[in-house]
Amino acid sequence: MKSKKGLTLTITLGTLALFLSGCVQTTKAGKPYGFVYEYLAKPGQNVMEWLSQLFGNNYGWAIIGLTVIVRLVLLPMMINQQRKSTYQQEKMSAVRPQMEKIQARQKAATTQEEKAAISNELMQLYRDNGISMTGGIGCLPLLIQLPIFSALYYAIRYSPELSKATFMGISLGKSSLILAILAFLSYLAQGYLSMIGLPEEQKKTMRLMLIMSPVMILFVSMSAPAGLGLYFFVGGLFACLQTLIINFFRPRIRREVEAELKKHPIKTPTPTQPKPINATESKPSHPRPQNNAGRGRNAGKQQRHHK
C-alpha cells in the first residue's frame, strides 16, 4: 500500500516538473504575463513579502513559515489518510496466507482461462474482506500543494527581491545542491520510518518506490531555485513527524484490525474452475437424422438403371 503512495508522489512530482518547465509567458523585454503569473506568481510574491516582514525581511524564514502553515493545515488530512493506509496494511497482512496460496495457484496455471479465473478469485478475496486496492491513499494533499509549488517557484523566479535573497549564505534564486541533498535525505528518512514494524516481505516490495520518490525530489530541487528546495526540506521534516505519529498509533490500529477479524473472520472465496475451451464446441449427443427418403429414391434409380 505504501508503494502506491510512493507512486502517487512520484507521478505528482513528475507533473510538477512538467508544470514548472514553462507555464509563464514573457514579452520580448522579458516581462512575465499570463494566467499562471497573474493568479499564482503575483499573489505568491505578495504573500512572501508579507511573511518576510514578519521575520525581519528574511525570505528564507518566510519560506519556512509558509511551509509550516501549509503543512499544519494539511496535517489532519494527511494523518487521516496515512492512518487509513496503515489500517489497510494490517488487513492485507491478515489475509496474506490466503493471498499467497491463490498467487501460487496463479503461477502454476497453464492457460489464460485458469489465470483469469484465479485473478478474479484474488479480487473476490479483497472485496469480501474490505481491502481497498488503493490502500486508502489519496492524492488530494499533493494536488492542493501543486499550486503552492508553482506560486513559490514563479514568485522566486520573477521577483527581484526574492531572486536576490539569501538564507544562511545560500542564494534562494539559484539552485542549491546542499538544500537538494537535505530534501532528498529528509524524504529518504521518512521512507525508512514508514517501514518500521512492517513484515520483511512487505518491506521488499516498498523499497523501490520509497527510493524513487526522494530521487525525484532530488532532481526537482536541483533544477529549481533553492527556495523550492528549502520548501521540500522542511516539508520532508513534517512528513517524518507524520510518520512518527502513525508509528505511535500502529499498535492501536493493529488491535482494531484484530478485533474486527474476531467479529468478522477472513472470508476465503471458493476456488473457481475455468470452463474448458471446447465446451461449446462439443459434439451433440444425438446423431444427426439421415435423409432415408432421399436414400430410397436413389436406390430406386439405381435399380432401374441395372434393369
Swiss-Prot record:
PROSITE patterns: PROKAR_LIPOPROTEIN
Lipid-attached positions, N-palmitoyl cysteine: C23
Key words, A-Z: Cell membrane, Chaperone, Lipoprotein, Membrane, Palmitate, Protein transport, Signal, Transmembrane, Transmembrane helix, Transport
Any one GO molecular function term: membrane insertase activity
Thylakoid listed as a keyword: no
Lipid positions (S-diacylglycerol cysteine): C23
GO biological process, one term: protein insertion into membrane
Sequence intervals crossing the membrane: 59-79, 136-156, 177-197, 205-225, 226-246
Presence of the UniProt keyword Signal in the record: yes
GO CC terms of this entry: plasma membrane
Family, similarity comment: Belongs to the OXA1/ALB3/YidC family. Type 2 subfamily.
Annotated protein name in UniProt: Membrane protein insertase YidC 1
